[in-house]
């Protein structure tokens, strides 16, 4: 949650349009994320409520495959320009195996930034959020 809170602050300051998807209302709450679009539904249902396209980005931060994997699958199928997922190299290896089993090609899976963020060396929530937003901004400019 802390990484997401810092990330939202950075993204807001850069004028990104933000939607938070998390079925767990105790994580994705108005108290934690005031003035943001919060969808407390599973990704399969949540993506029906927002318009996404090749100009969309996805940052998966839950560490829960039941939440992150469907979101990543949606992003891959809809050709989001940026897709990133939090987790260690081992977590990402396991994620890639699951996506391959779900029918995604190696080329598609390689579009996911995992572990997410540029290597700054930091371990704190604000440092991780900064590394993620830096990678997102870089991809945003490369996408134009």
Spans of model-derived segments:
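Glycine-rich adenosine-cofactor-binding loop
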Residues: 1-15, 20-22
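Residues in the short beta-alpha loop(s) of Rossmann-like NAD(P)-binding domains
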Residues: 22-25, 89
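Adenosine-phosphate binding glycine-rich loop
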Residues: 80, 86-144
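Rossmann-fold NAD(P) dinucleotide-binding segment
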Residues: 67-80
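Structural motif
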Residues: 56-57, 82
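Short amphipathic alpha-helix with an adjacent loop that forms part of the alpha/beta core around
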Residues: 43-54
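Conserved SAM-binding strand-loop segment of SAM-dependent methyltransferases
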Residues: 36-42
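Short loop/helix-cap segments at secondary-structure boundaries that form the rim of catalytic
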Residues: 26-36
């Amino acid at each position: 949650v802390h990484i997401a809170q810092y990330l939202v602050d950075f993204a807001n300051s850069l004028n990104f349009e933000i939607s938070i998807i998390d079925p767990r209302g105790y994580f994705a709450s108005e108290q934690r994320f005031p003035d943001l679009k919060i969808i407390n539904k599973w990704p399969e249902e949540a993506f029906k409520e927002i318009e996404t396209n090749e100009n969309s980005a996805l940052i998966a931060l839950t560490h829960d495959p039941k939440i992150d994997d469907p979101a990543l699958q949606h992003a891959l199928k809809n050709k989001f320009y940026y897709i990133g997922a939090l987790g260690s190299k081992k977590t990402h290896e396991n994620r890639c195996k699951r996506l391959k089993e779900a029918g995604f090609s190696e080329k598609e899976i390689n579009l996911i930034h995992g572990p997410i963020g540029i290597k700054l060396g930091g371990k704190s929530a604000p440092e991780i959020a900064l590394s993620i937003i830096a990678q997102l901004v870089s991809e945003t400019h490369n996408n134009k």
